[in-house]
Amino acid sequence: MRLLVAEDQSMLRDALCQLLLLQEDVEDVLQAGDGQEAIRLLETHPVDIAILDIEMPI
């Protein structure tokens, strides 16, 4: 499973990605620090699940 984590707080984003990568069915976790970066990543790297911060800079 491929995931995207979009979170503007880098420490929280890094920790969440590390935890997700420990799951055996997770093969890759993409990271985005803002909404624009998340959209750019999704245009070229399809994911199964996107985990998005509700209050994040565009």
Model regions and ranges:
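Receiver (REC) domain active-site loop signature in two-component systems and cognate sites
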Residues: 56
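Non-catalytic signal-transmission and effector/linker regions of two-component phosphorelay proteins
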Residues: 1-2
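Short acidic/histidine-rich motifs immediately flanking catalytic phosphotransfer sites
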Residues: 45-49
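Conserved acidic carboxylate
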Residues: 7
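Helix N-cap/capping motif at the beta->alpha junctions
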Residues: 31-40
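Solvent-exposed polar/charged
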Residues: 22, 43-44
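Active-site residues of response regulator receiver
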Residues: 53
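Two-component/phosphorelay signaling modules centered on CheY-like receiver
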Residues: 10-30
